[in-house]
Design a protein with these regions (language model features):
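Intrinsically disordered, low-complexity polar regions and short flexible loop motifs
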Residues: 1-244
Length: 244
């Protein structure tokens, strides 16, 4: 492929569908190496991390690397991995994920053919350094390509409570976002109805005995409420039965 210096321009699309340049950087491409540029931070003060790693010829195996782009750059995680279906207690400690560093990990069950990871299905766990309490667990991941997989932890805005995602990068232009299988969500409700009466909103999951209700006056915004992952039925009512 192409080698030598390459200029990269990063831009975003604003609310008027116009391109706004974030920054321009130059990277040096090397023969037989992959170059990964990670943009993090915010648009006003972007952070660019550039990583290089050797591209190997792999057969029925893959390599595993990871880094972190959490807002708090001091945040680190211990990385564990198990064969699909095995609990955390059977997982193998691979090492630490650190911001600003791209770390490669060693397969715990290498053989004479290769010390790289076998193509298979796995579960990945993250803990705080030195802890055995899981703070992030992936669903079953099919790591079935003979390539280099790069894992990137990042902050996640939105309804998920712990606010973290794990991105999985391959050779393609697609980035696979993985969220915690046990992540809880949050919701809040705004009563915008033109009525003098308060509205009662009820969230009902699989267990009707644990239904959550909140009453809101006109124009009132409720607090964030945490709920477990799952499907919910939402009902709203007013005391005079004008809304159901």
């Amino acid at each position: 492929g192409e080698k030598g210096d390459l200029e990269l321009e990063f831009y975003r699309i604003d609310s008027d569908d116009q391109e706004v340049v974030i920054d321009t950087i130059t990277v040096t491409l090397k023969t037989s190496y992959k170059t990964l540029v990670v943009l993090s931070g915010d648009f006003e003060s972007p952070v660019f991390d550039t990583y290089e790693y050797y591209r190997e010829s792999l057969e029925d195996h893959f390599r595993l690397l990871a880094t972190s782009t959490m807002f708090d750059s001091t945040t680190t995680f211990d990385l564990y991995m198990s064969d699909s279906g095995d609990p955390f207690e059977a997982a193998n400690y691979l090492g630490t994920i650190t911001s600003g560093e791209l770390t490669e990990y060693t397969y715990w069950d290498g053989d004479d053919d290769s010390e790289d990871f076998n193509e298979d299905e796995y579960t990945i766990y993250l803990t705080e350094p030195g802890s055995d309490e899981v703070i992030f667990e992936t669903p079953t991941l099919s790591l079935a390509y003979n390539t280099e997989y790069v894992l990137i932890t990042r902050d996640l805005s939105g309804a998920i409570q712990n606010g973290m995602a794990l991105d999985v990068l391959l050779n393609s232009t697609t980035v696979y976002e993985v969220t915690d299988v046990d992540a809880t969500s949050q919701y809040r409700i705004y009563n915008s109805l033109n009525t003098d009466s308060p509205v009662t909103v009820t969230f009902t999951g699989d267990d009707e005995a644990e239904a959550i209700s909140v009453q809101l006056a006109p124009g009132e915004v409720g607090e964030f409420t945490e709920v477990e992952y799952g499907d919910y039925r939402i009902t709203a009512s007013i005391a005079d039965n004008s809304l159901t």
